[in-house]
Regions:
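Pocket-lining segment of extracytoplasmic ligand-binding domains
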Residues: 1, 62-158
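Acidic, polar ligand-binding/catalytic clefts
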Residues: 1-18, 90-93
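Extracytoplasmic
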Residues: 6-9, 17-19, 34-36, 77, ...
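Short secondary-structure boundary/capping segments
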Residues: 11-14, 31, 139
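Bilobed "Venus flytrap"/periplasmic-binding protein-like clamshell domains
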Residues: 17-79
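Ligand-binding clefts/hinges and TM-proximal coupling segments of bilobed small-molecule sensing domains
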Residues: 47-55, 122-196
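An extracytoplasmic/periplasmic, membrane-proximal ligand-sensing/linker region
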Residues: 72, 78, 89-102, 106, ...
Length: 232
């Protein structure tokens, strides 16, 4: 992948955090138990695939990855053909909420030091997933901060003009996304939240300034990001 990604891409806004789910039989007590096991990480090159590959590599765990669509993977896990299914998405995540089989549970993902540079700590509770967590229980996991990014097109190009139109439409209609029937995760998003070491798309920055959207300080943003996975 490009070495100078921060020069080739800009960001429009930070989005919400997406939690990581590891579903396996109750005999699997921790991530290390999946070493050498058959683990489905969804289809190649998607968000779940990328996150799972990075997390297992950093933890020094080497499962046998399988690339299956979530519904098929869960059926195979029920049948005993694979050992675990990984999913990444904002809670409540539909495929995880819909999985009902008391032989399985959510495996904890500890916030180990190798994960702390790129991920955030998160907590799942029985209120989030009563089908996989006993009443009153909680399971620690990690969360992936999602970002709406765009290629750094030159301002005088047609692509940049289309990006400008998209930003205006997206930002203008954004309050609608924070209400039903849209996903509750949209309520976590602050359009003005900064992304350290990244440049915001100039037209997005201009829109926020023109519409007097208050900037969020880096310290306040960091505090919000650390808290939001556990409280959303």
């Amino acid at each position: 992948f490009a070495k100078d990604i921060k020069k080739q891409f800009t960001y429009v806004t930070k989005l919400y955090n997406e939690e990581m789910y590891v579903i396996a039989s109750k005999s699997v007590r921790g991530m290390s138990d999946l070493n050498g096991k058959k683990v489905s990480v969804d289809l190649p090159n998607g968000g779940t695939f990328v996150t799972a590959a990075i997390v297992f590599e950093r933890l020094g765990i080497k499962p046998n990855f399988l690339y299956l669509e979530q519904r098929i993977a869960m059926e195979k896990m029920r049948a005993g053909e694979i050992d675990a299914v990984i999913a990444v998405g904002g809670k409540p995540y539909k495929s995880v909420s819909a999985f009902n089989d008391d032989r399985f549970h959510l495996v904890p993902v500890d916030y180990a030091k190798p994960l702390q540079t790129d991920y955030l700590p998160a907590t799942l509770t029985s209120k989030d997933y009563p089908n996989l967590i006993p009443e009153g229980g909680r399971v620690d996991t990690i969360a992936v901060p999602a970002v709406l990014a765009a290629y750094n097109w030159a301002p005088n190009t047609e692509r940049y003009r289309k990006l400008s139109q998209f930003v205006d439409a997206f930002f203008t209609k954004f309050p609608t996304f924070q209400n039903p029937p849209f996903h509750p995760k949209w309520k976590e998003v602050s359009l003005s939240a900064p992304l350290p070491d990244w440049q915001r798309l100039p037209v997005a920055e201009q829109w926020l300034t023109t519409h007097n959207v208050e900037a969020v300080s880096p310290a306040r943003c960091d505090e919000f990001l650390k808290q939001s996975p556990a409280t959303a």
